Design a protein with these regions (language model features):
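N-terminal assembly/interaction segments in proteins that build large macromolecular machines
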Residues: 1-217
Length: 217
């Protein structure tokens, strides 16, 4: 009603007036910090996606509107294969001729908080298995190369759960750099020096203990 009054009863102008007001409000929300959100994993038609989308509050992160938005973004990534978040913003939104970027202001208004698509990973080869922990606080996507038609779903799920629990920095020892090993060794020696039982031990003994720890790292 207010829009019609402002536009002298012109319906088309009223719609445009409302749209402009909505975009202005969305722009104001865009400056607010989006530190909450959720991760979502999607696997379909041989493609695996995990995406993180942020909002402002935990309450919003659990809302049906926000969850539906995150799922739509995952579907866009799976179907249109954008290279990065910038490219994703130029993709067509699900069931629309508008791009993700053009759709964002309306989503910000309907959901009521600033929204940010933080990051994503997409695999289109081998077998992808997704796992989401703690209601979307942690999202993992594992991509496995299998032979002989083996169903790797259960293995992939177990690996994904381990990753969610332990947050490993590397897949195997070959990926661990000398710099990382040197830093871990330095930390281990420093911790030993703070332990009265270990601090008095000879350096050679400390070195041997640390090397044992490094083999387990």
């Amino acid at each position: 009603k207010k829009a019609l009054v402002e536009c002298d009863g012109d319906m088309d102008k009223a719609v445009e007036w409302l749209r402009e007001k909505g975009l202005a409000k969305a722009a104001k929300k865009a400056g607010r910090i989006a530190a909450e959100g959720m991760s979502y994993a999607l696997t379909e038609n041989g493609v695996g996606v995990v995406v993180e989308v942020n909002c402002e509050t935990d309450f919003c992160a659990k809302s049906d509107l926000f969850v539906a938005f995150v799922k739509d973004i995952a579907k866009v990534i799976a179907e249109q294969n954008p290279a990065d978040v910038d490219a994703l913003m130029n993709c067509k939104y699900v069931g629309s001729e508008l791009t993700v970027s053009e759709t964002m202001p309306e989503k910000v208004m309907s959901i009521g908080e600033n929204l940010q698509i933080r990051r994503f990973v997409r695999f289109a080869e081998n077998t992808s298995v997704g796992y989401v922990h703690a209601g979307g606080k942690i999202g993992v996507l594992v991509n496995l190369a299998v032979e002989g038609g083996i169903d790797a779903t259960e293995i992939g799920k177990n690996v994904a759960m381990q990753i969610a629990a332990l947050n490993p920095r590397f897949w195997d020892k070959s990926q661990v750099t000398d710099e990382v090993l040197a830093e871990e060794k330095k930390i281990a020696l420093a911790l030993m020096d703070t332990d009265p039982k270990m601090a008095s031990k000879p350096d050679a003994v400390k070195e041997k203990i640390v090397m044992g720890k490094m083999n387990k790292f």
